[in-house]
């Protein structure tokens, strides 16, 4: 079963309190104290509901109620408490001495709420933007394109000019190489000369002399002797004689042409 009503509410006055009713209620509470709000209207001689008497005393007639406008410091405190407690006006009023919960609620609904709502909407929009920006994955920039250099082959090689050696086995081989070049040049001239062509059973063909084979045979003997450095340095006379013979190998083209003109050539 529910709680029974404080009064039958028949024949009771509703609306604003008059000054006479305020003085009657104040005198009764000072004489008998607070409490027992159900029986207070009958005992005080008021045609009001017990709840209405209680609210009138707590919100307007108490001697410790702070009158006047709410200061700026009280507004900041109300805003902070409202963020923590919400619409629990009685708890907020308990932290503001001299202010009632009804007064704070009315002031919030008429003044503070209108000031705070635009700020809260701006803050909420900023928070949403920050959350969206945090939720998005960071855009990774594409890696820079690598510059590939084309390999270029060096066609020219610059090397310091070296003077030819003046001692050792390579120095001994220089006249041999020069004589070999002279023999090859002479052989090419012989092949181009028409006087050096002889008739044989197969036709007219240029006569080729085996200077190259003979030279390689002699040169092989020289190189084999040069492998042993001790023998080369001991027998200088033999090497000089070989160079002289090799120098005489240069043929006289005119004498060779006269030899080929002879009829007794086989």
UniProtKB/Swiss-Prot annotation:
Keyword match DNA-binding: yes
Localization of this protein: Nucleus
Protein name: Transcription factor MYB123
Record region (Disordered): 114-146
Record's keyword terms, sorted: Activator, DNA-binding, Nucleus, Repeat, Transcription, Transcription regulation
Gene Ontology cellular component annotations, sorted alphabetically: nucleus
Matching InterPro entries: Homeodomain-like_sf (IPR009057), Myb_dom (IPR017930), Myb_TF_plants (IPR015495), SANT/Myb (IPR001005)
Biological function: Transcription activator involved in the spatiotemporal regulation of anthocyanin biosynthesis specifically in the inner pericarp of red-fleshed kiwifruits. Functions in association with BHLH42 to activate the promoters of LDOX (ANS) and F3GT1 that encode the dedicated enzymes for anthocyanin biosynthesis.
CDD domains referenced in this protein's UniProt entry, alphabetically: SANT
Annotated Pfam families: Myb_DNA-binding
Broad class of the protein's primary localization: nucleus
Record's signal peptide: none
Organism phylogeny: Eukaryota, Viridiplantae, Streptophyta, Embryophyta, Tracheophyta
